[in-house]
């Protein structure tokens, strides 16, 4: 690579470079080889430059060719010919110097930027030679470099003065900046501090100003490469890929490296030298890379000069705003959330100093990915330590997690017995929580679980854990089923009140250590246990916790039984539980025979074969003793209607459970079952629950992709009144302007997207309109309500995950008619099958304006892999979201449709709410389909809100 210099003015071409001296007509080419300055002869070969022809400007120009600055030179004796330089008034030329045997060694400063890039401030930049089409192509163009990030005002000024004058003022240069809600963020997570003008979700530089543009816009690209030197905070992100002894580096994601490496290293799709942490968490002395599957070798990268560290201290007297901290060197303020997230944000790395090793609490099980029983999904987690931290800080008793470095996705689960919920995946790591130190010993004595840690022995406290939790603890430690006694699980009539007293029986996911389905009942007259040393489970998991507590807590009791245990530790079969016969000496096998949850299988959402959840197992219900009263109670418990119609059945079973629902529903096992119960749930007005929701009185077929394009719901069609009666509008109360869509759930609740309220969360700012069709005219069918409350999903932070909210309006609420109807909720096991076509509806943007009349479109669910690969921006899609639309463009939901329904038709004709319109990049553009929040994963939360339960 060489630099072109014309009349002493440097002109940068991104590609091939030459050195011209004086004028283009009189030019020579120079390069440095092993510190020796060489000149190109007329034959095209390079030879050492004779020391007598050397001038300092030659050294400066040669160092510039490797993006360095000239420091000094020295002469050196040679055993070969050299070449000299001669110049006339019009041309310079080279000639052989037969008698000159001394050359010149040139010493340059460290390489700051790779050849082909230009140093601007602390950045190494290059510019695309051709425009690219959109954000996704821009990222692809820059790879393995990245789109420019964290532009400082001084850097923008330098770009404006040195680069932009050669381009038209209208030219756009894409950066890594993206709008996330109301905030602009650079690709590295930093907040954009400068003012941004224009509309759009992507950030570009135009004539020295930051402007917002559509992410599909054609633009040129500023690519930012890593510095070819080591910053003083031991950071290197350059492109050196050879070791100090010249060996080529292997790819970090080479399969032989992945399978044989000992350290927990980041999986990278390149072979560049990088700093890594050793087994003690200390950063390596130099950048390294793999040259063999199990051999890390050092790379030589020079240190950056002090001026290139680009540290600008915070002005004296300034302080960081609330919620931020200052880097140790005072270079900048960062969010407190970025501290110890295992991603360096401070130039000196101080935000990651003295951070806890969260992985010490977990053991690596293998290359698996959670596929079920997921309680939380976190995206943009840059390191597995961050995922471990999320699990440790989870309020939902996280027991294990899987982490995918490539997608930076973290999945949490509340159970450690998850092998049935795991899928093999080589790029994912599955960790399970462990007891914190290897010197913790567990044993069972007299049916009581004891722990010994730091030579201190005590029983392990049962902190009101659920039956499922206790079972997990006992079995993970290698013991059998937990032991329950009649004393701790007496009949309800002899005990004090249950706390809490409300829990919906169809929501086992709401079960907590104090839930009614798992309640540890305590008799007011019970004798307190003696005060003995005891361990809390949380303390056993803490490396630094070594103190027992003097506690009256009930101990955890474990058996050695594989199926079920009596209170005295004797073992029984599972089918001996709740069978009407006392098999345990104290009768505890017939205690706690309550039915907590029912479900329907092999049918529709409102009819099918009955099963009951008992001891974490779904068991069949016998048809033999089922009557109308019991089926009514079961349907009511499942919220599928007030009446249960018993259907004929041909399914035979040898054993199952009989149900009795006098007060609460209890069960008894029967070994004389002949048929599996099958029912259909019916409402008070004689219609099935399916007829209560998702119905419409006007039949309109949504158009498919073959129809001509009509601007949006883009590419859809204009409906007629009552066509999609569950579609509601959220409007600005003052201006009556359309704001977002929503869907009717019941008389007082609607569901929408949480991001609709990012700018203003005040309920007084909005009103809800149902039964509308033309929002510019009064149809006479509208019902208008003010908002009483907005319920955000607890984990919602921004548009990219958990983008769902429930609106509450005052009682008595909506009057249902042919223009206003609730939509059905999907079943918990609703499958988002690629290719399934469903309907979106709303009054959102039609490209140039909002629609006056309700629009609708039929669009298919898109395979997640195809969606993510259609555009880089879709890597932001969370696991609780899905993609729908057409990759070729033309039909989609758009601005103003957010919060509206993605409705799928069931076999019985009713519509279910499969998704909530969330976000997208552009409207109906090629390779930019819409993103929708799944509804099925949030059913428990939705039920809790509707039923007024705590969440």
UniProtKB/Swiss-Prot annotation:
Its EC number is 3.4.21.-. GO terms for biological process: axon regeneration; larval development; positive regulation of gonad development; positive regulation of MAPK cascade; positive regulation of nematode pharyngeal pumping; protein destabilization; proteolysis. GO terms for molecular function: serine-type endopeptidase activity. Residues 355-435 form the PAN domain. Disulfide bonds join 320-333, 327-346, 340-355, 387-410, 391-398, 461-571, 474-584, 545-561, 558-571, 566-584, 578-593, 622-681, 635-693, 661-673, 740-756, 838-904, 867-883, 894-923. It is found in: Secreted. Pfam families: Ldl_recept_a, PAN_1, Trypsin. Residues 1-27 form the signal peptide. Keywords: Disulfide bond, Glycoprotein, Hydrolase, Kringle, Protease, Repeat, Secreted, Serine protease, Signal. One of its GO terms (cellular component) is extracellular space. SUPFAM superfamilies: C-type lectin-like (SSF56436), Hairpin loop containing domain-like (SSF57414), Kringle-like (SSF57440), LDL receptor-like module (SSF57424), SRCR-like (SSF56487), Trypsin-like serine proteases (SSF50494). PROSITE patterns: LDLRA_1 (PS01209), LDLRA_2 (PS50068), PAN (PS50948), SRCR_2 (PS50287), TRYPSIN_DOM (PS50240), TRYPSIN_HIS (PS00134), TRYPSIN_SER (PS00135). SMART domains: KR, LDLa, PAN_AP, SR, Tryp_SPc. Residues 490-523 are annotated as: Disordered. Residues 234-304 form the Kringle domain. InterPro entries: C-type_lectin-like/link_sf, CTDL_fold, Kringle, Kringle-like, Kringle_sf, LDL_receptor-like_sf, LDLR_class-A_CS, LDrepeatLR_classA_rpt. It comes from the Eukaryota. Residues 713-947 form the Peptidase S1 domain. Residues 433-585, 598-694 form the SRCR domain. Glycans are attached at residues 241, 329, 464, 536, 544, 602, 650, 776, 869. Serine protease which ensures proper pharyngeal pumping during larval growth by regulating the levels of extracellular matrix component fbl-1. Independently of its enzymatic activity and probably by acting as a ligand for tyrosine-protein kinase receptor svh-2, involved in axon regeneration after injury by promoting the generation of productive and stable growth cones. May play a role in gonad development. The Kringle domain is dispensable for larval growth and axon regeneration after injury. Belongs to the peptidase S1 family. This is Serine protease svh-1.
